[in-house]
């Protein structure tokens, strides 16, 4: 959530940044009108309260006490009625504020959509092949690693069963990713895959992405779409010490997404699934630590890809493609030979104090005052897409797939 006082005092400037993030202008107009109306109604309430305070003190020495008592009684009714008006406006403002995204950092390039994202650098050279390459789903079915038919039978479309060496490779990747992240100083945590609504609000999934969530019927529980949600919220409504920061955590989880609006995209294979696995990085830190932490997390995920021998690139997201809670995001895209292009495999985001304000995560600063932390998150890595990348980049002419050297000890 944005700082509403800052938004009110700098509305035009912040509104321009929000427009760059495709916030509906009608919503911004409603927000502006609310600020104006709330300011007017608060001023009237303060006027009534000032009258009450002043003349309550004078009641004992007043010459016409009964008349003043009557005036104070009437004024008390005005205060109650006006307080109700102010409370209703503040509640409405709070609801609208939950639907307003984070503002982009000044370093984020302006752009309408993913076509205007900016490539920062490429890492490693994509492999060349002297034979006709196959797509991962064809390789997987031939090797009996991927069973799409039975996945659909027991669930529905966008579900797959991993088998044999495919399942072993997936498990090896999870273990390797966790070990790699831990070697970089990230503490391993294991969290529930079902969380309550307050937790979803804390990191910004609700109310904006309600249609993309799987909700448990007749219960206030949701399946997580990323372990960023429970891990960040581990510290909701807490005040941390400076000595505890930065917190660096890594977490494996299954993730669940309805993929609303993704009809027709990546319908074959396991690139876009309703259920997938991911190893996440999450950091909670002081504001003056967040830029260094962003670079540390980005380097961790990029170095992990490099250790697997996978060519990839760093892509700075433009304002129009930036996520709801993020102030800045760099995507890592891995090379897929069958598509002859790079595909997203990780997003590293700095959310600044946006999630911390929603989740009420604070620390005691040097002046002894409570200050909001900064939160960051990033995939290190998406397991299914890493599996896809290895299958395609390590395929051989006979249809077999070599296992990267760093993974062999996990088999």
UniProtKB/Swiss-Prot annotation:
Associated pathway: Aminoacyl-tRNA biosynthesis; selenocysteinyl-tRNA(Sec) biosynthesis; L-seryl-tRNA(Sec) from L-serine and tRNA(Sec): step 1/1
GO annotation, cellular component aspect: cytoplasm
Cytoplasm keyword on record: yes
InterPro entries hit by this protein: aa-tRNA-synt_IIb (IPR002314), aa-tRNA-synth_II (IPR006195), aa-tRNA-synth_II/BPL/LPL (IPR045864), Ser-tRNA-ligase_type_1 (IPR002317), Ser-tRNA-synth_1_N (IPR015866), SerRS_1_N_sf (IPR042103), SerRS_core (IPR033729), tRNA-bd_arm (IPR010978)
Gene3D superfamilies: Bira Bifunctional Protein, Domain 2, Serine-tRNA synthetase, tRNA binding domain
A single BP term in Gene Ontology: seryl-tRNA aminoacylation
Protein name: Serine--tRNA ligase
Organism: Campylobacter lari (strain RM2100 / D67 / ATCC BAA-1060)
Name of the gene encoding the protein in the UniProt record: serS
